[in-house]
Amino acid sequence: LQVRERLAKRDDLELLSLPEDQRKDEAARAAALNAADVAILCLPDAAAIEAAALIEPTNTRTVLIDASTAHRIDPDWTYGLPELSADQRGRIAASKRIANPGCYASGFIALARPLVDAGLLRPSAKLVASAISGYSGGGKPLMGVFEGGGPHEPWGAYAFNLDHKHLPEMRAYARLKAPPIFLPAVGDFAQGMVVSVPLHYERDLKLLPRLLKRGRVAETIHAALSEHYAGANFVSVMPLGLDAWKEGELLERGAFLRPDSLNDTNRLQIFVYCNEEKKTCVLAARLDNLGKGASGAAVQNLNIALGIDEGRGLQ
């Protein structure tokens, strides 16, 4: 997750660490957790649940930020996507239990939620989402495959059981009645991510006839997203359609929307590509799966929880 690397550079925080021989000692772990102002849990789901249970009932000070999927739709935990809604940042600031979002979910929700809230995207829409991620998203086992020097795939799709672990939060926080059909893939690059959602105007959107007649749907979608993220520090809506491609740093070789252009940042970019004649649209979100999709989001939530500039230590 790169959380320690990001926090080690800070001079406003004191990091608490257990000696190697105490890291499986429950009493030592409990003491460290209860001594911390903020604890970030970078653990598998079951271990994160166990760690959260170590907080003493009388401890009303320690803030937990859980990077696992264990608590993301738990009503007793606050979803750690500050840009989710106008009041989400305040909810995070007031919470002692913050669930860090999943990387894929961050991109999908960033695209869908504003359009649902604006009354443009039907909550009943049966969406499809596809995504490509760097192999670091698979943790040490997958990193070992790609970096071990042996043969490996240049690209690989997965989750063909159609039950990816991010689906519950994708449905819940996009305010959809059903989760999308989600088709993720891993590429032969370490970091970076693009999440794409295609839309059919008449099937998925609630549009006034005059918008369809005038061919103004793309502008309407773009305006809704721009309004939602106005003033956001880390989320930006790029110029509409192919105009975004004219910015040389965004599209290399004139043809590719690269997933790795935001690596080592906490930024997320949104693109809107529509064909008014065909009445179709593709929304795309680009982010670093280890940045806004993981450690960057955790640090942003930590900053909000501590009441300091949410961008401290982030790019």
Predicted feature residues:
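Short alpha-helical basic/polar micro-motif
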Residues: 96, 113, 219, 296-297
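N-terminal Rossmann-like NAD(P) cofactor-binding subdomain of oxidoreductases
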Residues: 1-153, 158-160, 273-276, 311-314
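Active-site catalytic microenvironments for nucleophilic, acid-base chemistry
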Residues: 114-118, 200, 301-308
